[in-house]
């Protein structure tokens, strides 16, 4: 999708369609020619459009405009929230994409509480996401959309808007990279495949270097927890390290992203139920969001030093697989009693977290994982859980989520929960019982991040949409992560 901005008089601006947001209590935009405003007014009085929230109506042959049609979008009778505005952008884009329109123009909304820069940046991102399609495996893909370009229009020239749409598009591209990886079937997307994706990114972007540790190398280094998960599969586990140097390394160290990359999760010996097990291909959503964030950072050429680590493995039942009751030694030297092999994400993450701290000395570490079903019970599909040992980091991530509509919610990491992980035989066990499952999983990870500013995002409820024809990866939390990185570049 191509984007542009314009402040040419609307009468001289050629487009197949002009998108206009209208509320029940708002006057018609003065930027529209008087004849067009009168035409819309008559259209409304006739009952064809009442500006109710989410209503979309085509008005053909608008007067005194060099556009074939108007798409009228109702905003209702009260001010739109940011989330409501983004939802309307998504809905309008879907309508445009299913029409004959090739080039559309979007009349920016002076009545919205957010800035024009925000509207263009987040609008471009949502448009990029809304035109996404994944039909790689269909023998007869659906016809491609005609929509190729969207121009944001405002009467006053604003030099920030060009940068805004470029930023929005780059984030949207990153989101769609994450969605592509999540939507791939597990027979094609496995740990070695993800290594190939990383290497391809390294070839595409000069400032990105890639290193891959094999399962054997990881085991030799002492990653006993990671190896315990990976050894049950014919597919070899991989520790994938991508280092982006958009700024010179400093004594402070880089920011690190660490993603859980379980490309398929059967639960291992603690086998999951068969129903919806197909959706366990999405258990690499954390890794997918790391790849997507790296893509965006490279596209924007951000002036930061970033290290991104993906712990990629399959969790499969096998004669070599870890058993409930096994005790393993982690890279940190701490020992873990494995009581449930389906609590494998924290096992691969704990060694990846230790690795990135030992090798790269980051000042901030953020891990991202589809970690617990308990998080879905607590927060549903709207917010990812945000845990952190640093209040400023937590607040920065929550602010980034609010800014982009990719929202999170703060969760406790109180010492009182740590006792649920006590083991009679090892330093800790990998589950904390039936209560507060998302919290105890985060407490487990906190034991491997005591010396660094750290946050954990549990995205089990937000990484994909479950069931039905709308099923698919969402690409979250790429918008939150990339906004945080931009704010701290």
From Swiss-Prot:
An annotated Gene Ontology molecular function: metalloaminopeptidase activity
InterPro entries: Leucine_aapep/pepB, Macro_dom-like, Peptidase_M17_C, Peptidase_M17_leu_NH2_pept, Peptidase_M17_N
Recorded superkingdom: Bacteria
Positions contributing to Mn(2+) 1 binding: 265, 342, 344
Assigned keywords, A-Z: Aminopeptidase, Cytoplasm, Hydrolase, Manganese, Metal-binding, Protease
CDD domains for this protein: Peptidase_M17
Matching Pfam families: Peptidase_M17, Peptidase_M17_N
E.C. designation(s): 3.4.11.1, 3.4.11.10
Gene3D superfamilies from the UniProt entry: Leucine Aminopeptidase, subunit E, domain 1, Zn peptidases
Signal peptide: none
One Gene Ontology cellular component: cytoplasm
Compartment(s): Cytoplasm
GO-annotated biological processes: proteolysis
Free-text cofactor note: Binds 2 manganese ions per subunit.
Record: active site: 272, 346
Cofactor(s) listed: Mn(2+)
Catalyzed chemical reaction(s): Release of an N-terminal amino acid, Xaa-|-Yaa-, in which Xaa is preferably Leu, but may be other amino acids including Pro although not Arg or Lys, and Yaa may be Pro. Amino acid amides and methyl esters are also readily hydrolyzed, but rates on arylamides are exceedingly low; Release of an N-terminal amino acid, preferentially leucine, but not glutamic or aspartic acids
Family according to the record: Belongs to the peptidase M17 family.
HAMAP family: Cytosol_peptidase_M17 (MF_00181)
Function: Presumably involved in the processing and regular turnover of intracellular proteins. Catalyzes the removal of unsubstituted N-terminal amino acids from various peptides.
Name listed for the protein in its UniProt record: Probable cytosol aminopeptidase
Organism, scientific name: Alcanivorax borkumensis (strain ATCC 700651 / DSM 11573 / NCIMB 13689 / SK2)
């Amino acid at each position: 999708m191509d984007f542009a901005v314009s402040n040419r008089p609307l009468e001289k601006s050629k487009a197949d369609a002009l998108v206009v947001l209208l509320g029940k209590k708002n006057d018609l935009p003065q930027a529209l020619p008087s004849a067009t405003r009168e035409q819309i007014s008559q259209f409304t009085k006739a009952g064809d459009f009442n500006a109710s929230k989410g209503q979309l109506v085509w008005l053909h042959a608008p007067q005194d405009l060099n556009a074939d049609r108007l798409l009228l979008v109702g905003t209702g009778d009260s001010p739109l929230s940011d989330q409501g505005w983004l939802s309307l952008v998504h809905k309008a884009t879907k309508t445009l994409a299913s029409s004959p329109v090739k080039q559309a123009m979007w009349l920016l909304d002076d009545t919205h509480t957010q800035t024009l820069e925000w509207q263009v940046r987040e609008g471009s991102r949502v448009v990029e996401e809304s035109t996404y399609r994944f039909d790689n495996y269909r023998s007869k893909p659906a016809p491609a959309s005609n929509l190729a370009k969207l121009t944001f229009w405002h009467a006053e020239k604003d030099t920030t808007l060009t940068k805004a749409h470029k930023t929005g598009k780059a984030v949207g591209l990153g989101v769609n990279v994450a969605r592509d990886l999540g939507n791939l079937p597990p027979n094609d997307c496995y740990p070695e495949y993800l290594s190939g994706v990383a290497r391809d990114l390294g070839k595409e972007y000069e400032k990105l270097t890639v290193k891959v540790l094999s399962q054997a190398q990881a085991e030799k280094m002492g990653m006993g927890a990671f190896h315990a998960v990976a050894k049950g599969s014919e597919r070899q586990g991989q520790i994938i390290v991508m280092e982006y140097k958009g700024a010179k390394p400093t004594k402070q160290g880089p920011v690190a992203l660490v993603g859980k990359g379980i490309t398929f999760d059967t639960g291992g010996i603690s086998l999951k139920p068969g129903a919806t097990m197909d959706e366990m291909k999405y258990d690499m959503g954390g890794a997918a969001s790391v790849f997507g964030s790296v893509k965006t950072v490279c596209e924007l050429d951000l002036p930061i030093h970033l290290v991104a680590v993906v712990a990629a493995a399959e969790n499969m039942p096998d004669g070599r697989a870890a058993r409930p009751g096994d005790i393993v030694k982690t890279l940190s030297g701490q020992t873990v009693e494995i009581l449930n092999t389906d609590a494998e994400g924290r096992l691969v993450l704990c060694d990846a977290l230790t690795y990135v701290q030992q090798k790269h000395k980051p000042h901030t570490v953020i891990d991202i994982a589809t970690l617990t079903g308990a998080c879905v019970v607590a927060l549903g599909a709207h917010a990812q859980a945000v845990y952190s040992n640093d209040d400023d980091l937590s607040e920065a991530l929550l602010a980034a989520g609010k800014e982009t509509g990719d929202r999170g919610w703060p969760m406790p990491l109180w010492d009182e929960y740590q006792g649920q992980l006590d083991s009679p035989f090892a330093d800790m066990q990998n589950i904390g019982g039936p209560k507060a499952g998302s919290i105890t999983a985060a407490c487990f990870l906190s034991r491997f991040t005591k010396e660094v500013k750290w946050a954990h995002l549990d995205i089990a409820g937000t990484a994909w949409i479950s069931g039905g024809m709308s099923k698919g990866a969402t690409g979250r939390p790429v918008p939150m992560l990339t906004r945080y990185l931009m704010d701290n570049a």
